[in-house]
Each structure stands twice: as C-alpha cells, then as structure tokens.
Amino acid sequence: MINLTEHLHLITLRRGARRTQASLEGREELGGKAQGLFSVGQVLTDIMACEFPDIRIDIPEMTVLGTSVFDAFMERNQLAEIAYSNLPDARIANAFQRADLPFEVLGELRSLIDGWVTPLAIRSSGLLEDVTQRPFAGVYLTKMIPNNQGDPDTRFQKFIESVKFVWASK
C-alpha cells in the first residue's frame, strides 16, 4: 500500500510558507521530475490498492520548494542578470551564496532539517529540464550532503548552501 501524501510535500509562497501536502491544485509549482514522481505515485497508489493490496512500496519522503520560492529568490536578490550572463560559474555561484532565501520559507526549512539526520540529495526539478523537444536533463547539479553534524545550526546552514549551489548550477 502506498500513501503518497505522506511522502510528497510542497513548500510555496503562493499558499503561504507552510508544509502542505502536494495536490493537483499545486502542480504548477512543481518542476518536471517532481510532477513525474507525483503522477507515478498517484498511479501506483490506485493500482496497488486495487490489484495488489498486500504489496508495500516505500517511497522516500520528498519536499519540493515550489517555483514561486525560486522566483522570489531570484527577484528579491536581483540575480537574473548575473544568472544569465557569461560570467564564470564561480562568480555566479558566489552571488547565489551571498543571496538570501525568502524569509517566509526559512522556518519551514529549519523545521525539516531539525527533524532529519539522514543523508539528503538536493536536486533541481526545473521546468527547463523537461522540455520534450530540448531536454536539459543533467544540466543542474545534484548536491549530496551527509546531514550528520551534531549541531542543528550547522546542518541547516549546509542545507541552505546546498539549495543555493544547485540553483546556481547550469
């Protein structure tokens, strides 16, 4: 049995900075990979419940920062010009690291990190990565973090740095 809503959460600015269960109403906030996982999870949930009720599939917990969070990050820090420039990657990454994430989501992100002490994969689910005619798969980096530091402040800082690192990659 699969209960997808226990495993897929969406953080967005449009519906307030809170952990919400992903639903069809929030799918415009999801990039391609997240939408794909959500869709596959829904199909599996329906099939498994009807045809294979005794089989259990474990889906890792996943939290998605909606596109509105990324858009606010870019706009509030005026990063569009530098992000789309021909500057060296190191300069772009440095600008992203100096920028602030939207304050509305920091508390929610902090509570996630406080509750997790397992390794994390921070990945992009950008809309451009999934254009059918010109896929950008693999353009954005994945950042793996051990998330095993004893100090929650250090774990949170490493997590935020990783989010910015992935967003800066291109």
Where do the model's predicted regions map?
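N-terminal beta-alpha lobe that positions the nucleotide/phosphoryl donor
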Residues: 1-170
